[in-house]
């Protein structure tokens, strides 16, 4: 019999190994799904004791002790916005910071689904507001990705950090790329660095220009974002010209973008614009027309005031008309 086994082709033996692994995985998955459904059934029926027993035996959940789970009922309740089920599970001792294999917490799920009531319940139960997945994603990132202003505000109130390490996904960049200018405004009001530079993405302003998100570009510029900072040597004006977005090009020029700035290929914004396009004609016209003295004075005054103090312009002893002019209103 051993001789027969040895004479089998190697490929056939290998396929048998893979088939065995697949069978075990499917069996484990079936058991998990069955117990999750059973646990949910007991919760619905109000049998908390039985649901808690399943949780303790299957998920290893006990009060005050961490747990690892591929996908716990707490994750499901948070992702679907089922507040009553969420509270029931928490009262039965489910770990509020239970993580999946990718380190996703129930709070991540609640924010991704824009379920602010579930997010608040989890935070009140002690959820880690700055939990990070293996991809570097935080609950605040998920909230900004979905454009959830309520979750964004809630997380910041509970101590969420708008900026972690420089290479991790940034909520500011995510909001700017998706066009969620209201989330962006909330982040700015909490003091986020609007010029945060992530090497492979650039600044939020550059990302907004690449994504053609006019309202986000305007919000960032109003907040004092550096109009010249982009990605490496590419400026936001390079990005807007490349995307042929006339509105954004006009806005950047109004805020003092350098039309002669060169990227790593020694190309100016007009050089990366589509030939004979409206953007190319606009840039050539601006190049031949000097900025007005009023425009130059406004840029000079804003630079002198500095970004951290731009919000104090309304407190200056100046006529309202001049205050509005300095704030591009």
Curated annotation (Swiss-Prot):
Pfam families: Ank_2, SOCS_box. ANK repeats lie at residues 69-98, 102-131, 135-164, 167-196, 200-229, 232-261. Pathway: Protein modification; protein ubiquitination. May be a substrate-recognition component of a SCF-like ECS (Elongin-Cullin-SOCS-box protein) E3 ubiquitin-protein ligase complex which mediates the ubiquitination and subsequent proteasomal degradation of target proteins. May play a role in the initiation of arteriogenesis. One of its GO terms (biological process) is protein ubiquitination. The SOCS box domain mediates the interaction with the Elongin BC complex, an adapter module in different E3 ubiquitin-protein ligase complexes. It comes from Bos taurus. Belongs to the ankyrin SOCS box (ASB) family. Keywords: ANK repeat, Repeat, Ubl conjugation pathway. Gene3D superfamilies: Ankyrin repeat-containing domain, SOCS box. Disulfide bonds: none annotated. Residues 278-329 form the SOCS box domain. This is Ankyrin repeat and SOCS box protein 5.
